[in-house]
Regions:
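Post-signal-peptide N-terminal segment of Sec-exported extracytoplasmic proteins
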Residues: 66-72
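Short amphipathic alpha-helical segments enriched in leucine
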Residues: 21, 60-64, 98
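Mature-region segments of soluble proteins
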Residues: 2, 55-58, 72-175
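Residues marking the start of alpha-helices
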Residues: 7, 44, 106-108
Length: 175
């Protein structure tokens, strides 16, 4: 009796899962989706384009730079601009920002590799209403996130816990 063996294998579970993930990711990216560089967070946009949202996130990071604060928190801070009310102001502002970057020889603001060069571009338009709106709203949008407080060592408000007098008022050790 002769045994016939073949090396033909069907698709493995691993290959099936990899294929499904790739298809799912390509569908999501095509539908107003912004993902962080670490891919640990993602955001869906409705009224602004993913490119505009990515530019806003980079702009926020350049205005208030903190190396220990993840992009996710900057994304949350600018998420409010993804609305019908801000749509035209964001589009016009990003176009002006990209035009300023193109004047420096770059394709867009997002393609400027060095923070110092991006800051110069921002300084050139710091008197614009677009810049002032973004900068002003970032103060509360970024720093009012309780998750960010812990990154800066801020324990939050103390009124509900009896105030600061008996709770950490004298615990500083750097004086």
């Amino acid at each position: 009796m002769e045994t016939i063996t073949t090396n033909a294998r069907g698709i493995s579970r691993r290959d099936l899962l990899k294929g499904c993930v790739m298809v799912g990711a390509s569908l999501a990216v095509g539908s107003g989706f912004v993902a962080g560089s670490s891919a640990a967070w993602a955001m869906e946009t409705i009224h602004v384009t993913p490119s505009e949202m990515a530019t806003l996130i980079q702009m926020a990071r350049d205005i208030y730079p903190h190396n220990h604060v993840a992009d996710e928190y900057y994304a949350r801070a600018v998420k409010g601009y993804d609305s019908e009310d801000f749509k035209s102001q964001i589009a016009e502002g990003i176009n002006a920002l990209n035009a300023a970057a193109q004047g420096q020889g770059y394709a867009s603001y997002l393609t400027v590799p060095w923070e110092a060069d991006r800051v110069k571009i921002l300084q050139s338009m710091e008197d614009s209403s677009f810049f002032q709106t973004i900068r002003g709203n970032l103060i509360t949008g970024l720093y009012n996130q309780p998750e960010v407080w812990t990154l800066f060592g801020y324990e939050g408000e103390s009124y509900s816990k009896g105030g600061y007098i008996n709770r950490g008022f004298n615990d500083i050790n750097w004086i």
